[in-house]
């Protein structure tokens, strides 16, 4: 993902958490906020708590989520801020299960074309 497609600052994460709508399943929680700024692309942030595991496990989960988003981002509506929060169950899952969870949440949010 390019730098302008990522949510990096704490204030941006908090805005999505407070004002956005949430969708969840057993592996992930998705927060969606309609971004009315002059940004033409959707931005994404990924959050994995220390409850999920050590740094190796957390990084693996982040990589799986970001890769599944990257491969499906061409099918996603633009001008949204998205934050994926990994749940504890996601640490043992395969790429296919994480990808299915990501696409399921995007479809439920109405962002998947």
Swiss-Prot record:
Gene Ontology molecular function, alphabetical: 3'-tRNA processing endoribonuclease activity; ribonuclease P activity; tRNA binding
Top-level taxon of the source organism: Bacteria
EC number of the protein: 3.1.26.5
Pfam families from the UniProt entry: Ribonuclease_P
Catalytic reaction list: Endonucleolytic cleavage of RNA, removing 5'-extranucleotides from tRNA precursor
GO cellular component terms given for this protein: ribonuclease P complex
Annotated coiled-coil segments of the chain: none
Gene Ontology biological-process annotations: tRNA 5'-leader removal
Gene3D superfamilies cross-referenced by the UniProt entry: 3.30.230.10
Keyword set, alphabetical order: Endonuclease, Hydrolase, Nuclease, RNA-binding, tRNA processing
SUPFAM superfamilies noted in UniProt: Ribosomal protein S5 domain 2-like
Family, similarity comment: Belongs to the RnpA family.
Subunit comment: Consists of a catalytic RNA component (M1 or rnpB) and a protein subunit.
HAMAP family: RNase_P
Function field: RNaseP catalyzes the removal of the 5'-leader sequence from pre-tRNA to produce the mature 5'-terminus. It can also cleave other RNA substrates such as 4.5S RNA. The protein component plays an auxiliary but essential role in vivo by binding to the 5'-leader sequence and broadening the substrate specificity of the ribozyme.
Protein name: Ribonuclease P protein component
Taxonomic source organism: Clostridium novyi (strain NT)
């Amino acid at each position: 993902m390019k730098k302008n497609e990522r949510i990096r600052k704490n204030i941006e994460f908090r805005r999505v958490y407070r004002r956005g709508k949430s969708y969840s399943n057993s592996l992930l929680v998705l927060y969606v906020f309609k971004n009315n700024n002059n940004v033409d692309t959707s931005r994404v942030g990924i959050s994995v708590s220390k409850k999920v595991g050590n740094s190796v496990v957390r990084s693996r989960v982040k990589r799986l989520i970001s890769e599944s988003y990257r491969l499906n981002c061409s099918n996603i509506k633009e001008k949204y801020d998205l934050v994926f929060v990994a749940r504890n169950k996601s640490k043992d899952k395969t790429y296919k299960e994480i990808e299915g969870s990501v696409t399921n949440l995007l479809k439920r949010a109405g962002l998947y074309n």
